[in-house]
Amino acid sequence: METFWLRVSFWVALVGGVISDNPESYSTNLSIHVDSVTTFRGTELSFVVTTHQPTNLALPSNGSMHNYCPQQTKITSAFKYINTVISCTIFIVGMVGNATLLRIIYQNKCMRNGPNALIASLALGDLIYVVIDLPINVFKLLAGRWPFEQNDFGVFLCKLFPFLQKSSVGITVLNLCALSVDRYRAVASWSRVQGIGIPLVTAIEIVSIWILSFILAIPEAIGFVMVPFEYKGAQHRTCMLNATSKFMEFYQDVKDWWLFGFYFCMPLVCTAIFYTLMTCEMLNRRNGSLRIALSEHLKQRREVAKTVFCLVVIFALCWFPLHLSRILKKTVYDEMDTNRCELLSFLLLMDYIGINLATMNSCINPIALYFVSKKFKNCFQSCLCCCCYQSKSLMTSVPMNGTSIQWKNPEQNNHNTERSSHKDSIN
């Protein structure tokens, strides 16, 4: 058993990225039944090894605190520093990547269209998580306690932290759904061409996405409280989900299934449905003189569709291990089983891997756009080199809405001016 734990600790140290740790579970021992050791954009495993149950905290379902596993968990110093380094890396990449993406879309008029507006909304949600949540995660990892735990600001952070975590994931999920719908609309209206700009319907969608994401995150702000506990003779407080009402008890019971269904399955199902419809639409309109005339636009729209599909696949790969771990713990794990300890240690390892991958999703979208989209690749290179508008050579590029745009020097003739604002409708 001791050798097994050494192996687990070793692999956790290797695969551990940022512990995107939601204070939802401050467990004291492997055998304690915890609501959700991990949730979205973070959940945490206990960083403090203790055998004291926090006071004012609901006991496990059987009302007992016995049947501990013979081994306890602890976070080694090496593991903390490894995760801190990776966390800082994700912070830098997420800050630079998402901020640059927002700047590109804001400063280039040819990039201001429906799908790019949704991508900007996606990047802004990731940026909020990176700027606010990651520093708190690193502090908790190194200090082993909740920041400002003894004053009111700590209580404010306890409410804000999980609220922003869940809101950020909601923004990601709903924007991916909106992008899938947008791609189908673009193909269904493939003969329509209109000017540059963000359609009103897309602006309404984005506002609705943010409002709905905040509303769905309200239970997190309500349920998370500062819970006092004793550790090594000293009094501490930590932030965790503590169900004190019937609604919160219900929310706590169905939370894993709710997260899996709405925050994971829904964008995948939505993408599958609308991409199937989009494929059928393309096959049905494969012939015809109008299609031949607009073949370039159709080709560009297919490229955009592939980019959106790539973002959805990355989302699925990043979040699947975490959801799988949560569902296995909900369905297979039995806290009263005497042989549960090895299973729980495996689930904890899956939690670490899943948490790290889920956290990386907040910085990977700009990287994916760089490699998938030639237009974004050119803009990233020019923007990061501080020469976005200083190019003296003619550059022909394809924005995310599938339009052929030409950038010309002021000295050149204006006979292509109309083409510079030519844009096919994807909305």
Curated annotation (Swiss-Prot):
List GO BP terms, alphabetically: developmental pigmentation; enteric nervous system development; regulation of blood pressure; vasoconstriction
Disulfide feature: 158-239
Residues listed as glycosylation sites in the UniProt record: 29, 62
Q: Which positions carry Phosphoserine?
A: 425
Membrane topology category: Multi-pass membrane protein
GO CC annotations, alphabetized: plasma membrane
- According to the UniProt entry, which residue ranges have a biased composition of type Basic and acidic residues? 416-427
Bias (Polar residues) occurs at 405-415
List the stretches on the Cytoplasmic face of the membrane. 103-112, 182-205, 279-306, 373-427
Q: Which GO terms describe its molecular function?
A: endothelin receptor activity
- The membrane spanning regions, by residue number, are 81-102, 113-132, 160-181, 206-229, 257-278, 307-328, 348-372
Alphabetically ordered keywords of this record:
Cell membrane, Disulfide bond, G-protein coupled receptor, Glycoprotein, Membrane, Phosphoprotein, Receptor, Signal, Transducer, Transmembrane, Transmembrane helix
Q: Which PROSITE patterns match?
A: G_PROTEIN_RECEP_F1_1 (PS00237), G_PROTEIN_RECEP_F1_2 (PS50262)
Q: Provide the family line.
A: Belongs to the G-protein coupled receptor 1 family. Endothelin receptor subfamily. EDNRA sub-subfamily.
The entry's protein name is Endothelin-1 receptor
Protein species of origin: Ovis aries
Gene symbol here is EDNRA
